[in-house]
C-alpha cells in the first residue's frame, strides 16, 4: 500500500478509516479501538496517514504506536482559521473539534449554499455554515446513549433501559427513549429554522455519525446521510498538504 494515503477519523468510541490513492477510495471501514487489525492490515511503510482525532489520550497513543510500528508517516490535523473558502468563526478557531472542522470542509465542497452539518455520535453537533462559507457556530448535545445514562443515573427510579420510539409512549422505557429522540431532532430542526432565517433561504442538511440512521426517520427536515463526511474533509485537507 506504499504511496497510499490513510485517512483516520478517530472519534470518542470508534475509529473510521479509508485508504485513498490518486483520488480513488480503495477501502474504508470502522474499527473499535479494542481491535485495530483491519486498519493495521492496510498500513505499509511509506504510507501517509492523516488523522483527525477527538479520541482520548490512551486511544491516541495506541494509534500512534500502531502507525510508528508500521513505518507510516503521521500528520495529526488541527482546526484552523480557514481552509479554501471556508472560514472558522469560532472565538478561538483552534478550540473547534477537528472532526467538526473536517465535516465543515467536506460540506462546503458538497454544497456551495447554506448548510446545516449534523454529526450524531457519542455527542451530537449541529453546525451552521453560511452561503459564503462562514462557520457561524453550532450546538453540542449529548447523544442517545449519554442521555439514557444520565436519566438512569440522575433520576430516583432510574429510567428503564431500552425502549422504542412511540409518538405517544405508554411505558417508562419508551417515554425516555422517545423523549431523547424528540430532543435531538428538535435541536436539529430548531437550528435549521434559525439558519434559514439568518440566510433567507432554506439550508441543506447533511448528517453523519453512528447515530444518523437512528435520527433520520424522525427528523422534520430533509437531510442527506453522508457516512464519510469527516473522512472526505480529511482527504481534502490531505491533498492540500495537511493544513486545514
From Swiss-Prot:
ATP binds at residues 9-16, 122. GO terms for biological process: coenzyme A biosynthetic process. It catalyses: (R)-pantothenate + ATP = (R)-4'-phosphopantothenate + ADP + H(+). A monovalent cation. Ammonium or potassium. Its EC number is 2.7.1.33. It holds the Pfam family Pan_kinase. NCBIfam families: baf. This is Type III pantothenate kinase. The lineage of its organism: Bacteria, Pseudomonadati, Pseudomonadota, Betaproteobacteria, Nitrosomonadales.
Amino acid at each position: 500500500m506504499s504511496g497510499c494515503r490513510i485517512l483516520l477519523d478517530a472519534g470518542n468510541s470508534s475509529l473510521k478509516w479509508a485508504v485513498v490513492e490518486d483520488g480513488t477510495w480503495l477501502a474504508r471501514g470502522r474499527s473499535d479501538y479494542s481491535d485495530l487489525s483491519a486498519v493495521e492490515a492496510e498500513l505499509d511503510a511509506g504510507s501517509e496517514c492523516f488523522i483527525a482525532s477527538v479520541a482520548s489520550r490512551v486511544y491516541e497513543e495506541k494509534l500512534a504506536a500502531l502507525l510508528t510500528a508500521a513505518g507510516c508517516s503521521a500528520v495529526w490535523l488541527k482546526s484552523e482559521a480557514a481552509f479554501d473558502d471556508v472560514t472558522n468563526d469560532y472565538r478561538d478557531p483552534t478550540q473547534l473539534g477537528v472532526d467538526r472542522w473536517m465535516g465543515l470542509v467536506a460540506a462546503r465542497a458538497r454544497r456551495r449554499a447554506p448548510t446545516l452539518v449534523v454529526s450524531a455520535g457519542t455527542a451530537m453537533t449541529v453546525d451552521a455554515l453560511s452561503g459564503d462559507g462562514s462557520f457561524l457556530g453550532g450546538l453540542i448535545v449529548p447523544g442517545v446513549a449519554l442521555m439514557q445514562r444520565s436519566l438512569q443515573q440522575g433520576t430516583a427510579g432510574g429510567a428503564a433501559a431500552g425502549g422504542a420510539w412511540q409518538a405517544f409512549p405508554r411505558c417508562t422505557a419508551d417515554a425516555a427513549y422517545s423523549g431523547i429522540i424528540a430532543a435531538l431532532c428538535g435541536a436539529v430542526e430548531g437550528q435549521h429554522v434559525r439558519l434559514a432565517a439568518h440566510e433567507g433561504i432554506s439550508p441543506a442538511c447533511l448528517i453523519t455519525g453512528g447515530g444518523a440512521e437512528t435520527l433520520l426517520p424522525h427528523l422534520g427536515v430533509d437531510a442527506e446521510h453522508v457516512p464519510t463526511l469527516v473522512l472526505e474533509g480529511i482527504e481534502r485537507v490531505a491533498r492540500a498538504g495537511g493544513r486545514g
